[in-house]
Curated annotation (Swiss-Prot):
GO biological process, one term: phenylalanyl-tRNA aminoacylation
Subunit details: Heterotetramer; dimer of two heterodimers formed by alpha and beta subunits.
SUPFAM superfamilies found in the cross-reference section: Class II aaRS and biotin synthetases, Winged helix' DNA-binding domain
Organism annotation: Danio rerio
Name recorded for this polypeptide: Phenylalanine--tRNA ligase alpha subunit
InterPro entries: aa-tRNA-synth_II, aa-tRNA-synth_II/BPL/LPL, Phe-tRNA-synth_IIc_asu, Phenylalanyl-tRNA_Synthase, PheRS_DBD1, PheRS_DBD2, PheRS_DBD3, WH_DNA-bd_sf
GO MF term set: ATP binding; magnesium ion binding; phenylalanine-tRNA ligase activity; tRNA binding
Top enzyme category: ligase
Protein keywords: Aminoacyl-tRNA synthetase, ATP-binding, Cytoplasm, Ligase, Magnesium, Metal-binding, Nucleotide-binding, Protein biosynthesis
Length: 497
């Protein structure tokens, strides 16, 4: 509430001027800032019908800072004219004055001065008239004295164009007496206490009306992490494109499904401890589809299905090793094997979004644990052209239009492509995904019919999130150093579809 003294002074002013009073006049009469008077009006309105206040707007002209300076010291052109002696003044010396550039231009337009470019000592400025009348200063002084009505609109607009005048809208209140008007402030109670009820003095108290429309205190609640917001958008995009979500509840996977089923040789560097987290307990898996396992073993060690294989001694002990899955393609392999067991093949489109784990060196764009997004399409006759078309459609829905494709090598896809997107924050191209056409050596041992092709792509969830939220360091998005305030403040992510 405003100061009680100001409230009572305002009420006394309304009492004296029975017909009403303007808040601007009250401000001037009491010698206080108008905003304080407005605050007093609001406080009195909160007390009930003590006063009635109607807001009104009025416009008036007032001088800018430069305008006030000119009203006191004269216009720039007048100052330039007065600075030129009878013998003239070198132009370069004139331009060094504070008002030199603007004043020279205006004085030339007014034909008060002339420039002699052929003068012996260099360009020199001379007066062309004996005396001048500083009309700009005179007009500004009229406005300063509250006589702006004496100026024509054209003159005001010219001064406004020179940024010497400004048209200001002032909001004020017309204040009159209310039905419960009194010059005495009666404190309103905000709470009904047990003591008031026990003593009965609540009957003499005046209570402040309860505002049922007031906003309550916002309840504390959970906030979605930016990753989860973007994950929701990705999931919606896949569903819009007609994909079915794959179950991804197995963080621990066997080397067979994670590597061998994908036609990745057991000597591949990615299977080394430097890139994979192996599980110590349970260390080995024992349940596999035996007929499928034998076909995988054969295509690795001897070849088949039109392939020479890798020609090495494939070991079941290596395939049994449990690990934290390094990609969700292991899930895709399980789903494609399940699809191959159906009596009749039907085209499918699968997707998944879940965590994967890699024993990588941490830096601004790499984590040991991150989310992989995977899309898989299986149908007859799919080619690299189909893959590129789906990728363009998919990434356009993400709002990522700056894309580059680069040929790559994957043991289980041929041809293969890496997908890069330009990161505005890092000012460089960042790899956001990998893609390719699954090899026959992977698909045919599963039991899928010849002629069926499977195109697939995968990307991380973290890097597109960094791009959309303008985050340069992945450790600011995920990990123990994340600022929780960022989670509270991060806006909803809308991918431009």
């Amino acid at each position: 509430m405003a100061d009680t003294g100001l409230l009572e002074a305002l009420l006394q002013r309304v009492e004296q001027l029975d017909g009403g009073v303007d808040s601007q006049d009250v401000s001037a009469a009491l010698g206080v800032d108008h905003q304080l008077v407005v605050g007093a009006v609001k406080s009195l309105q909160a007390l009930g019908e003590v006063i009635s206040a109607e807001q009104k707007s009025s416009k008036h002209w007032e001088l800018t800072g430069e305008g006030r300076e000119i009203a006191e010291q004269g216009s720039h052109e007048a100052r330039v004219f007065n600075a030129i002696p009878a013998e003239g003044l070198p132009q370069n010396q004139l331009m060094k004055m504070a008002s030199g550039k603007v004043g020279f231009s205006k004085a030339m337009s007014n034909k008060w001065i002339r420039l002699d470019k052929a003068h012996e000592g260099g360009p020199r400025v001379f007066r062309t008239v004996e005396s001048i009348e500083d009309t700009v200063r005179d007009k500004l002084q009229l406005v300063q004295n509250g006589q702006s009505a004496k100026l024509e609109e054209k003159e005001k607009n010219e001064l406004k164009k020179r940024k010497l005048l400004a048209e200001v809208t002032v909001k004020s209140y017309w204040i009159t007496k209310g039905n419960s008007f009194s010059t005495t402030i009666t404190k309103q109670e905000t709470e009904l206490t047990p003591e008031m009820i026990a003593s009965g003095n609540w009957k003499e108290k005046k209570f402040k009306p309860y505002n049922f429309e007031a906003m309550g205190v916002a309840p504390d609640c959970g906030h979605l992490h930016p990753l989860m917001k973007v994950r929701t958008q990705f999931r919606q995009i896949f569903l819009e494109m007609g994909f079915t979500e794959m179950p991804t509840n197995n963080f621990i996977e066997s080397s067979f499904w994670n590597f061998d089923s994908l036609f990745q040789p057991q000597q591949h560097p990615a299977r080394d401890q430097h890139d994979t987290f192996f599980i110590s307990d349970p260390a080995l898996a024992h349940e596999f589809p035996r007929d499928y396992l034998e076909r995988v073993k054969k295509v690795h060690s001897e070849g088949g299905y039109g392939s020479q294989g890798y020609k090495y001694d494939w070991k079941i002990e290596e395939a049994q090793k449990n690990l934290l899955r390094t990609h969700t393609t292991a899930v895709s392999a399980r789903m494609l094997y399940k699809l191959a067991q159906q009596e009749k093949f039907t085209p499918v489109k699968y997707f998944s979004i879940d965590r994967v784990f890699r024993n990588e060196t941490l830096d601004a764009t790499h984590l040991a644990e991150f989310h992989q997004i995977e899309g898989v399409v299986a149908d007859y006759g799919l080619t690299l052209g189909n893959l590129m078309g789906v990728l363009h459609q998919f990434f356009t829905k993400l709002g990522i239009t700056k894309l580059r494709f680069k040929p790559a090598y994957n043991p289980y896809t041929e041809p293969s492509m890496e997908v890069f997107s330009y990161h505005e924050g890092l000012k460089k191209w960042v790899e956001v995904g990998n893609s390719g056409v699954f090899r026959p050596e992977m698909l045919l041992p599963m039991g899928l019919p010849e002629g069926v092709s499977v195109i697939a792509w995968g990307l991380s969830l973290e890097r597109p999130t960094m791009i959309k939220y303008g985050i340069n360091n992945i450790r600011e998005l995920v990990g123990h150093k994340v600022n929780l305030q960022m989670v509270y403040d991060s806006p909803i992510c809308r991918l431009d579809s």
